[in-house]
């Protein structure tokens, strides 16, 4: 039988399974594909196929991630599942797998555990906007009251991290029983996917967001002016649009785009994903540099001080061999450039060991265009020693 081709006509959403080790994330992922495969909407994947996730490198960090895809009547999904806890932490902080929503798997037999809390906290800090709960292993719990107790605990935990605990859909099921083909539990997988369809909104597409392009290179064309090149990160740009040049200087500079080129051809409009050159009116060669961004005026602002959630590479990953302390001054690599910054660790945290993840405050020596969710690397002498995600802007 020929492989079915996924139709790209449906809206696309990125999701993933999160939760404590052994609560059934991978079994649930397998169950979703298996149940949907019976309706011809997925290719069934066995537990072992998902569990043997290939290693990928993102910002110099090795992460094991399994990717599966499937669809419902409403949407097309790309779903990530990580075998190990450390893989989740790295994945979420580097943004290697950007999630529009997550399915939090909690074993009804055990209730919320430390990594349940940690994954909810990470979701909050790296900007996973919506969570749907799957209470797993319900076939092992005879006591209805116990199920309700676990559900309440999970809802309280979500509320603690500013998710709407009262509104979050909670589906009670058994991934293993569904995987084994028990119709009563297969129905719960359908129920879960309906909740995901309805509760997790279709994300705004990158092209619909305000324009932004990190500047990679700058050159001047005699008689025409200054050109900034880079890959459009989001939004669209056309000739005549006003843009701001933001970062590395105290005040953003506003200018107008007088030409947009791609592969040396003139373009009416550039959009997210395009590599372009933008001709800037009245801007001299020394007023623009790599590391700045071009953006729709007022859409993003330069900052020097922020809080961030950071994963520190282990020695084996090529990171530091020794811990670091407050006042550590590495380079912070944002998009296209390094800026020195000073780290302040939270109260009660003396030092950070390779392999840890920690929230820290960073003060940069020059302003950079950042917002909540902006990703960065921490570098020392050109090698990556950490990866982070901005969780809060201070100034």
Swiss-Prot record:
Subcellular location(s) of the protein: Cytoplasm
Pfam families, per database record: GTP_EFTU, GTP_EFTU_D2, GTP_EFTU_D3
Primary site of residence: cytoplasm
Positions of region (G1): 19-26
InterPro entries linked to this entry: EF-Tu_GTP-bd, EF-Tu_GTPase, EFTu-like_2, EFTU_2, G_TR_CS, P-loop_NTPase, Small_GTP-bd, T_Tr_GTP-bd_dom
Amino-acid positions noted as binding GTP in the UniProt annotation, renumbered to this chain: 19-26, 81-85, 136-139
EC number: 3.6.5.3
UniProt binding sites for Mg(2+): 26
Catalytic activity: GTP + H2O = GDP + phosphate + H(+)
Annotated region described as G3, given as residue ranges: 81-84
Start and end residues of each stretch annotated as G5: 174-176
Domain tr-type G: start-end pairs: 10-204
Keyword Amino-acid biosynthesis found: no
Positions of region (G4): 136-139
Keywords for the protein's UniProt record, in alphabetical order: Cytoplasm, Elongation factor, GTP-binding, Hydrolase, Magnesium, Metal-binding, Nucleotide-binding, Protein biosynthesis
One annotated GO molecular function: GTPase activity
GO CC list: cytosol
Region (G2): 60-64
Function: GTP hydrolase that promotes the GTP-dependent binding of aminoacyl-tRNA to the A-site of ribosomes during protein biosynthesis.
Family: Belongs to the TRAFAC class translation factor GTPase superfamily. Classic translation factor GTPase family. EF-Tu/EF-1A subfamily.
Quaternary state and interactors: Monomer.
Protein name in UniProt: Elongation factor Tu
């Amino acid at each position: 039988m020929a492989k079915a081709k996924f139709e790209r006509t449906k809206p696309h959403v990125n999701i993933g399974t999160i939760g404590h080790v052994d609560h059934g994330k991978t079994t649930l992922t397998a169950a979703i594909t298996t149940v949907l495969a019976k309706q011809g909407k997925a290719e069934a994947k066995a537990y072992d196929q998902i569990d043997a996730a290939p290693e990928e490198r993102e910002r110099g960090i090795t992460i094991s991630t399994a990717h599966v895809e499937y669809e419902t009547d409403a949407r097309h999904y790309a779903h990530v599942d990580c075998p190990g806890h450390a893989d989740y932490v790295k994945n979420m902080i580097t943004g290697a797998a950007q999630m529009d929503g997550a399915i939090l798997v909690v074993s009804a037999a055990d209730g919320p555990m430390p990594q349940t809390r940690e994954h909810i906290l990470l979701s909050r800090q790296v900007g996973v906007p919506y969570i749907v709960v799957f209470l797993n292993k319900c076939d092992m719990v005879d006591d209805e009251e116990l199920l309700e107790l676990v559900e309440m605990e999970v809802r309280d935990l979500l509320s603690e991290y500013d998710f709407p605990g009262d509104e979050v859909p909670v589906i009670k099921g058994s991934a293993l029983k569904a995987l084994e083909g028990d119709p009563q539990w297969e129905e719960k997988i359908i129920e879960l996917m309906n909740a995901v369809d309805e509760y997790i909104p279709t994300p705004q597409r990158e092209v619909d967001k305000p324009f932004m392009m990190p500047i990679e290179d700058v050159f001047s064309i005699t008689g025409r002016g200054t050109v900034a090149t880079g890959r459009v990160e989001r939004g669209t740009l056309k000739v005549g649009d006003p843009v701001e040049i933001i970062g590395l200087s105290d005040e953003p500079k506003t200018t107008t785009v007088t030409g947009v080129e791609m592969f040396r051809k003139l373009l009416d409009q550039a959009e997210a994903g395009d590599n372009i050159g933008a001709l800037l009116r009245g801007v001299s060669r020394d007023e623009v540099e790599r590391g700045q961004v071009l953006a729709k005026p007022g859409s993003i602002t330069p900052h020097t001080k922020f809080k961030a959630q950071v994963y520190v590479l282990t020695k084996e990953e090529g990171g530091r061999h020794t811990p670091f302390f407050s006042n550590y001054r590495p380079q912070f690599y944002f998009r296209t450039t390094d800026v020195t910054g000073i780290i302040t660790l939270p109260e009660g945290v003396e030092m950070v060991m390779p392999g840890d993840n920690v929230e820290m405050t960073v003060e940069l020596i020059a302003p950079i265009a950042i917002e909540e969710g902006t990703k960065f690397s921490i570098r020392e002498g050109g090698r990556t020693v950490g990866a982070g995600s901005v969780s809060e802007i201070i100034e």
